[in-house]
UniProtKB/Swiss-Prot annotation:
Domain of life: Eukaryota
Helicase C-terminal domain ranges (all copies): 325-474
Basic residues: compositionally biased ranges: 20-53
Keywords from the UniProt entry: ATP-binding, Helicase, Hydrolase, Nucleotide-binding, Nucleus, Ribosome biogenesis, RNA-binding, rRNA processing
Protein name per its UniProtKB record: ATP-dependent RNA helicase DBP3
Pfam families registered for this protein in UniProt: DEAD (PF00270), Helicase_C (PF00271)
Family: Belongs to the DEAD box helicase family. DDX5/DBP2 subfamily.
Biased composition (Basic and acidic residues): 1-14
Helicase ATP-binding domain boundaries: 123-296
Amino acid sequence: MSKDELKDKKRKVEDEELKSKKKLKKDKKDKKDKKDKKDKKDKKEKKEKKEKKDKKSETESFAASASQSDIDEFLKENEVTVSDPSGSNIVPYLDFSQVSFIDQIQKEISKFPKPTPIQAVSWPYLLAGKDVIGIAETGSGKTFAFGVPAINNIVTSGDKSSSVKVLVISPTRELASQIYDNLIVLTDACGLRSCCVYGGVPKDQQREDLRRSQVVVATPGRLLDLIEEGSVDLSHVNYLVLDEADRMLEKGFEEDIKKIIRQTRSTSRQTLMFTATWPKEVRELASSFMSEPVKVSIGNRDELSANKRITQIVEVVDPFRKEKKLLELLKKYHSGPTKNDKVLIFALYKKEASRVERNLKYNGYDVAAIHGDLSQQQRTQALNEFKAGKCNLLLATDVAARGLDIPNVKTVINLTFPLTVEDYVHRIGRTGRAGQYGTAHTLFTEQEKHLAGALVNVLNGAGQPVPEELKKFGTHTKKKEHSAYGAFFKDVDLSKKPKKITFD
């Protein structure tokens, strides 16, 4: 063998040895990285478990400062019922001094006299990391009920990275905007970013906002569009809120909601639902992806009931005299000493609303309107003007009937009765909010006589007078389950462990 051949052979052997050493070194490094990754994951899980345990014990010790007699009186006065599958002995926060949120949040909530009932009862469970279903009348303070613990959790976790951690899904653009307006006060105070995502407006700014926000409020349709085009990552969401879930299903969003939930964490996610009513479809959906949820109910929810702080006046009228009667009512509720009182008028259909709007303007009234024939910009402007007091007369279809928090509405006028008595209760719930008193004046015609019995039940339940003309239509009502509203919450056993579901 020549010298050159020996050199080549030697070089090949050295190359093989070098490759072998490199491979060994790489395998060793990969093994170490894998071990480090596992240790890091185990450490993180251990830390999360400890934090959850500490959070629970802290929650219980703070709540314990309320006396049992005070708690009993509070539960009785507000007709509070709690169904907790785990049987944990958690008591409500009757005062802000009993709860320990971060300073920035404590400063914001202390501007209010005390927690509302839904806040007082749900906060201890939410701070203990439990899934919660909250059922309460509109105007109950549910946005802070779910928003305060959510934002507090982001800050205390120490992870302020720009990924979506809190997701609130809402049925309408108006309600989503309202929730966002409430939450941005807290996120700004805590140095976090939040955004509101809904349809009817360009996507460009929303895409940019989603990249930077930790808290997102969204309607299902637009959010799903952005998910499908790859503009939003929900894999870091650990706090999910479905607000007005019954309305979302009524609007046909069930499949969208399922697809959205699939994009979030399934194991470490805390899930909440806050609403006024619970149809069968939502109860079944809840049982599929909520983990042993605590059901918190404020007020008597066994039968449909109206806020007792609302004076209900029902007049039986000729259907052709309704608009003339409306002008008479506005002289009573919106002129002279009451000229600056906020009055909300409900029509049933958008064409009716357009006609009534023109008629009111013809008669000299400055009226804002929200209905389907208007653009999103026009609707938002109308709502903002009404909220700000620039225009104190608002005409709306049922798009504004659920969840919108418009402060200081003195009177609700039902020009046309809604399709269900449930919607009637939600409509009149725009007044008498946050402990205030209000008036609801309803025009009822023979065309709605099939709803007379159910309406009489609501009036009787709230201790309101029932006009003789209404009784003539009959007071018997057959107990049935409306297609959009369930009759019984407990049809689904929520104590069962959630099953793995497949989203098509």
